[in-house]
Amino acid sequence: LSLSGMYNGEMISAPEYKSLASLDGAGFHGGYNHIVYQMVGQPLGVFYLPHSTGLESDGNGGYTYGIADLNGGGVSLEDGEDRYVAGQAVPKTILGSNISFRYKRFDLSVQINGAFGHKIYNGTSLTYMNMNIFPDYNVMKAAPKQNIKDQTATDYWLEKGDYVNFDYVTLGWNVPIEKVQKLKKYVRSLRLAFTVNNLATISGYSGLSPMINSSTVNSTLGVDDKRGYPLARTYILGLSINF
């Protein structure tokens, strides 16, 4: 299917396959590195990839990604050939919640976010598990053992992207000023608080973080493109005084 029409007497049309996200940089020198597409009849941002049958020996001690012949006409990585829609990059469900508890002089606040129903392409593993880039680039610890010598983007590194992230947790204590005679004269209220940012992330994703770009900015929609860095966990101790 395709979309076409007329505007001011000129024929216009939308391509059947339009790449939205791809990989470049270390180990990529052109070729079939397009991963996420805009396609007629599909949700915005779908993974349109060759299907990998696993690792195959290259006959020289290394391994390459076996590719399935989906259309029975011989393996071809061109759009419309041996590729299939393997999932979507945009989450189907997004979670955001702020929960607060209070007990006597203690209070607890928790902020949670999450996303479900989408997939992530682990471009970091595709790139740095490829021994062909070594020693020009560093590789992962497991790379020499697996000895993969291939950079072809298939569904081999496509993973579920579901996650729940505890954005922050804050525990507070309102000090009973009325019981401290020396402070009672000068201080109206005193509160101590301890906050942990980025406490934990629950996810089956094997990369550094499932919280990657979910837009078409920089053509990285749904792709862990090896440039991201996980958010650091920080600890904050706070003191609030009202005179």
What residue spans do the PLM features occupy?
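Generic recognition of flexible, low-complexity loop/linker segments
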Residues: 84-85, 95-98, 180-182, 224-226
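Extracytoplasmic gating/loop element in the C-terminal half of outer-membrane beta-barrel translocons
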Residues: 57, 61, 113-199, 204, ...
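C-terminal beta-signal and terminal closure region of outer-membrane beta-barrel proteins
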Residues: 23-53, 149-153, 203-243
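Extracellular/periplasm-exposed beta-strand and loop segments of Gram-negative cell-envelope proteins
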Residues: 16-18, 37-40, 82-88, 123-128, ...
